[in-house]
């Protein structure tokens, strides 16, 4: 049985992503594969190339033939040189710089805006703020209503006859 190491396509229309697969030479491009040994994402910068070197060496040693695109990928990772015994087995694979974490970016933005990092959220939660305000307003309503009712009675009594009205609040 002739075995090939080839690319099987995944992804969207203009965003191809490939798996590096070992399959029978007679199967179609995205057909059944014997083993998946890596992946390749050409649209990323730099391109993502991950190949399980141990499995690639095994399949090359038992006679699997890489297709032209896979051969180029194997040369980039250094697996082809390692298999053939050529110099340059370390490969010339470019690695993307590590991305800063979101927490570091957040703390840096806070430091620029205010002057120092804090662990608290920028704004309090809406539910907590509204429920606390409602409770405070409900507690203040009966007190405010009682004081408002007492003031008009006291103001109206001296205006009528000049007599001092006895307030019911004193007893």
Curated annotation (Swiss-Prot):
GO CC list: cytoplasm; small ribosomal subunit
Signal peptide: none
One protein family per Pfam: Ribosomal_S16
Compositional bias of kind Low complexity: 142-171
PANTHER family given in the database record: 30S RIBOSOMAL PROTEIN S16 (PTHR12919), SMALL RIBOSOMAL SUBUNIT PROTEIN BS16M (PTHR12919:SF20)
Name of protein: Small ribosomal subunit protein bS16
Gene Ontology biological process: translation
Family in the record: Belongs to the bacterial ribosomal protein bS16 family.
Keyword line: Ribonucleoprotein, Ribosomal protein
PROSITE patterns for this protein: RIBOSOMAL_S16 (PS00732)
Record region (Disordered): 114-171
GO molecular function, one term: structural constituent of ribosome
